[in-house]
Amino acid sequence: IMKAAVVKGNSKVEIENFTISDVGSNELLIKMQSCGICGSDVEKVFGKYGQPSMRLGHEPAGEVIKIGDAISDFKIGDRVFTHHHVACYSKDCHECSHGNETMCKQYYQSNLNPCGLADNYVVPEWNVLHGGVLKLPDNVSYQEAALIEPLACCVRAWSKFKYQKNDTVAI
């Protein structure tokens, strides 16, 4: 049984129990050590988010505590950051081929179970096999690793700017 933070109404968060039967052959079970609280999490709690999942936390880092039979790239005890969703990145995918990976259908089918803000969570096969789990160097703390996804959002936004030398920008 795992415990996870779940939105249960307007401005109400509860801890809910989840049962995961086992880890699939290409899945990982992670003990969460740190998890960021994103603007979308805050919106789920206090706003009108309107998404089907009201589970919280998608910026987690933790320790591998169980591995599927077919996994050889990770071992128990590895310190990792896990992406909450992973797009297909196919040139045949309209969204991915136009730089809109967060709109990819596969992206929405690849979430952590039950969520990142849980004592333990399962990383699905798609994420494991498509680069959604990163081993952490020893000099990166779990707290720093929980900032990987927000930093990636900033880098992505910056890369979309069409700025030139001598332009004025607001930060």
Predicted features and spans:
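Residues that mark the start of a beta-strand
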Residues: 3, 27-29, 168
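Small residues (Ala/Gly/Ser/Thr
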Residues: 4, 62, 154-157
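Extracellular beta-rich ligand/substrate-recognition surface
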Residues: 6-13
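Short Gly/Pro-enriched turn/cap motifs at secondary-structure boundaries
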Residues: 8, 19-20, 51-58, 109-114, ...
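A generic structural signal for well-ordered coil/turn residues at beta-strand boundaries
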Residues: 14, 24, 116-117
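Glycine-rich beta-strand-centered segment in the early N-terminal region that forms part
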Residues: 21-35, 48-94, 134-137
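Cytochrome P450 core scaffold surrounding the K-helix E-X-X-R motif
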Residues: 40-45
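NAD(P)H dinucleotide-binding glycine-rich loop of Rossmann-like/cofactor-binding domains
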Residues: 89-169
